[in-house]
Swiss-Prot record:
Keyword Cell membrane: yes
This protein's encoding gene: syd
Superkingdom: Bacteria
Alphabetized Pfam families for the sequence: Syd
Main location (coarse class): membrane
Organism: Psychromonas ingrahamii (strain DSM 17664 / CCUG 51855 / 37)
Compartmental location: Cell inner membrane
The protein, known as: Protein Syd
């Protein structure tokens, strides 16, 4: 387990919650969807909103099913990023560019995430591109932030075209540079 990635992820969770506390004097809030319950939810629904907070998964999950299906070994930072916690998506800014970190809200969301991962890897294989895994969406819907599976480097990727730029040497360093934001 890459404790550095996990440490930086949980540090970002704390910075995200602190930003909400400073700006809104509360925990983060999400629209309550009764069919989409999460262990992150806290308290009662008010005005169709529910408070929430990222929580550590105990025990952490793994992605051995994806590794077996694709016959690859996932970079440990990818596994730590997606398997360590439940959380809603986390809006942030990277060097003046808005992004949203992808996380799993509940077990069903984690299963959907894994299906999307399989499709992403298969598309890359078909296009003869290096394997990478998305970790964040960008304001340009054709771009994602992803982790190169072979090296752990974080890159800006254009879907169907490949790498645009290396953003960080590793996921922990990338997470440390992010500034949390609140999307109204």
């Amino acid at each position: 387990m890459n404790h550095t990635t996990q440490t930086q992820l949980f540090d970002f969770f704390e910075r995200f919650k602190a930003h909400w506390q400073t700006q809104k004097k509360s925990l983060p809030q999400a629209i309550f969807e009764p069919q989409w319950i999460s262990p992150c939810q806290i308290g009662e629904v008010e005005n169709q909103l529910i408070f929430w907070s990222p929580i550590k998964r105990e025990p952490a999950l793994d992605m051995s099913n994806i590794e077996q299906a694709l016959d690859i070994k996932l970079h440990p930072s990818i596994v730590d990023f997606f398997c360590s916690a439940y959380s809603a998506g986390l809006p942030a800014v990277y060097q003046d560019h808005p992004i949203e970190l992808i996380q799993a809200w509940n077990d069903e969301d984690f299963n959907l995430l894994q299906e999307n991962m399989l499709a992403h890897f298969m598309m890359q294989k078909r296009l003869k591109q290096p394997a990478s895994m998305f970790i964040a969406s960008c304001s340009d819907e054709m771009q994602i932030v992803s982790v190169l599976n072979a090296t752990g480097e974080v890159q800006l990727e254009t879907l169907g075209k490949g790498q645009e730029a290396i953003l960080a040497e590793n996921l922990a360093d990338f997470l440390a540079t992010l500034t949390p934001v609140i999307i109204e």
